[in-house]
């Protein structure tokens, strides 16, 4: 039976219900994306490279302004400061690594002042005697994983900031995957290799190349926003789009019939098939593109 009637389309239930669903979904997307409703609960471990190359292998330059080390620490503090403004701040843990690993924070904290005090207390020139000057990425990742395993109920992100050339044992990457930890990299002043990209992609993380002067901006903006992106926002927008397609059922039918001179029964079928197509295609697109994963809560 044709959907077309001479009455205005907004007087029919299919239009009204679809319009209401569209409005609700858009409001939910706004609340989740802009106002912080339904936030992800995230634990973040920041592994900071403190090897010799970050201070030009000279104790006189240890954590001095302009060095990579100073830029890394400034970036961590900027992340912690912005994080404190969230309604549900990330729990942050920080470690430093070179030939060995040293914890900088005592467990997790969302207090930027506490994190800054811990950094000032631990990151001193005498630290070189404890951690050496190399880059042992296996130890850095294993330590970060052990730390994040203490927060099993939260979404877990590990970020490694390094200017070194390194390798990671495959079994360590497998352990990271097994515990649903996303491994992310900021590679400072070095080319981003295919292997680093692969390690990040395997665990659902990202790998970015960055200049020393841009570490703070990248960490406190792009990386921060990615860690705190709400996975429900694409879902709400997807439902909004589906609702819009159903809301357009009668308007499309009338357009096909009156503007394109298609028979009313065919116009009705085309408009219904169009709505059904987008109802099926939209969730497939969201899942295939990685915008939404129904099998993961993070």
Model-inferred region functions:
Residues 38, 56-58, 85-125, 137, ...:
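Short beta-strand-loop
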Residues 128-132, 138-139, 155-157, 162-222:
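VWA/integrin I-like adhesion module and closely mimicked acidic/polar interface patches used
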Residues 2-62, 298:
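Acidic, polar low-complexity linker/tail segments
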Residues 51-54, 76-87, 123, 144-152, ...:
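Sec/Tat-exported extracytoplasmic proteins
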Residues 211-298:
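C-terminal "exit" segments of structured domains
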Residues 57-69, 101, 105, 123-134, ...:
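Second-shell loop/turn segments in exported
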Residues 46-50, 96-98, 162:
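Flexible glycine-/small-residue-rich
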Residues 41-47, 52-91, 107-114:
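…and closely analogous acidic/polar surface helices at protein-protein or active-site interfaces
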